[in-house]
Design a protein with these regions (language model features):
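Active-site loop/oxyanion-hole signature of alpha/beta-hydrolase fold enzymes
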Residues: 1-38
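Acidic beta-to-alpha connecting loop that harbors the catalytic carboxylate
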Residues: 165-167
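Residue in the alpha/beta-hydrolase core beta-strand immediately N-terminal to the catalytic nucleophile
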Residues: 36, 59-62, 153
Length: 167
């Protein structure tokens, strides 16, 4: 991650574009010609990449709590970034506590935070597919991503961007 943050983007093992290609591969495997794509955070970045590189596969795009990759917009608050860069605990209970803490930082202060529901969802995520190295690869993919703003200006499908000032 340090080399990527230093500007060497060649070291990323699994890029957002790779994940976008995997998304299209899933559509192919399911025999889905095109789809409405909705992505949250990194999922929004992946959906943007699909819309850029495989436009005919995208009926509409919803990018939620995400960014274009531009260093001028959509940057995480320092306390959120610091928490996201910490290695997650490997045990389930520690990971659930960590995940609840991250989601609490991401939640808008103007709305109630449902800790019990968040704890349940983070636990289900851990049970389904926890891989600490995967988390690091995802953070590296985001850090290595280039600014998609110029390419996104060419996207011609109905698009909605949902973001808040207190996220």
């Amino acid at each position: 991650l340090a080399s990527i943050l230093g500007g060497d983007r060649s070291t990323v093992a699994y890029s957002l574009e790779d994940m976008a290609r995997d998304t299209v591969g899933l559509l192919d495997a399911l025999a889905i010609e095109s789809a409405h794509l909705v992505g949250l955070s990194m999922g929004g970045m992946i959906a943007q990449c699909v819309a850029i590189h495989d436009a005919p596969r995208v009926r509409s795009l919803a990018s939620i709590m995400s960014t274009t990759g531009s260093p001028r917009v959509g940057q995480a608050k320092p306390e959120v970034l610091a928490e996201l860069l910490k290695p997650p605990p490997p045990d389930r209970d520690g990971y659930v506590d960590y995940g609840v803490g991250v989601w609490r930082l991401l939640a808008s202060p103007g709305f109630p935070f449902d800790e019990a529901k968040t704890r349940e969802l983070v636990g289900r995520s851990y049970d389904r597919s926890f891989d600490p190295k995967g988390v690091a690869r995802q953070i590296a993919a985001i850090a290595a991503a280039r600014d998609r703003t110029p390419a996104l200006a060419e996207v011609r499908v109905p698009t909605v961007v949902i973001h808040g000032t207190d996220d």
